[in-house]
């Protein structure tokens, strides 16, 4: 049900009145206002807030995501939203950060390739997608690849501590150019990767070739016991 209110003569406070001037009478009219329960619920999900001003037209917009009552707060993130392929594999997806499990790295790889396929404009021309590291969990062995450009065999140390694969490298290089400017390069790798239980830790093999470290870990043979159950 709507509420009806009768409006009579109204004078706007914004309009100035000169002394002696008369205000013309306005005939009464009817205005209907819906009750609060009749107002539709607004399903707003995204609200854009943009800074004002007379300066240059830079895009300072911020995406504000309104969360339902069940959520615990409001998520705010600056646009454009970056996907996992935009984040450097040596940043948030750093495989060299301490103590990662092999399952985490496999999940990260899946997420990278899914984003590259589903996001429009990615991988235009059918180019190859290559991340600086890769893990393949095969039937009889686990194979790993880590790109380590500029690193020699003497700079890399691979070891297994209990169930953890440890890869360390500290490479420094300094060259003097013909233009009297010295060139320095420094790379440091340090990772601890927890291995699954079905690995033969004593038979881990590592090879460094053309700046790429290849690691092969054989899997243990699982003996399956088959027991025939007699049906009565």
UniProtKB/Swiss-Prot annotation:
Polar residues composition bias: residue spans: 1-25
Biased composition annotated in UniProt, kind: Basic and acidic residues: 55-78
Signal peptide: none
Listed GO CC annotations: chloroplast
Subcellular location: Plastid, Chloroplast
First and last residues of the transit peptide: 1-46
Assigned keywords, A-Z: Chloroplast, Plastid, Stress response, Transit peptide
Main location group: plastid
Domain sHSP, residue spans: 124-232
Region listing for Disordered, in residue ranges: 1-35, 48-81
SUPFAM superfamilies: HSP20-like chaperones
One of the GO BP terms on file: response to heat
Pfam families with a match to the protein in the record: HSP20 (PF00011)
Presence of the UniProt keyword Transcription regulation in the record: no
PROSITE patterns, per the entry: SHSP
Family: Belongs to the small heat shock protein (HSP20) family.
Identification of the protein by name: Small heat shock protein, chloroplastic
Annotated organism of origin: Pisum sativum (Garden pea)
């Amino acid at each position: 049900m709507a509420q009806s209110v009768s409006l009579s003569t109204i004078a706007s406070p914004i309009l100035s009145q000169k002394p002696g001037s008369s205000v013309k009478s306005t005939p009464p009219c009817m205005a209907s206002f819906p009750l609060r329960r009749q107002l539709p619920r607004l399903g707003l999900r995204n609200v854009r807030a943009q800074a004002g001003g007379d300066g240059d037209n830079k895009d300072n917009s911020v995406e504000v995501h309104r969360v339902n009552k069940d959520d615990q707060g409001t998520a705010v993130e600056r646009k454009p939203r970056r996907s996992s392929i935009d984040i450097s594999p040596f940043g948030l997806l750093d495989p060299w950060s301490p103590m990662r499990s092999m399952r985490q790295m496999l999940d990260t790889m899946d997420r990278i390739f899914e984003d590259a396929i589903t996001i429009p404009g990615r991988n235009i021309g059918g180019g190859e997608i290559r991340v600086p590291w890769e893990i393949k969990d095969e039937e009889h062995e686990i194979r790993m690849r880590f790109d380590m450009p500029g690193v020699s065999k003497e700079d890399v140390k691979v070891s297994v501590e209990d169930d953890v694969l440890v890869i360390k490298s500290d490479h420094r290089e300094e060259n003097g150019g013909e233009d009297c400017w010295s060139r320095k390069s420094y790379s440091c790798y340090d990772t601890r990767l927890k291995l699954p239980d079905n690995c033969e830790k004593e038979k881990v093999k590592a090879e460094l070739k053309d700046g790429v470290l290849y690691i092969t870990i054989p899997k243990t043979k699982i003996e399956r016991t088959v027991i025939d159950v007699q049906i009565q």
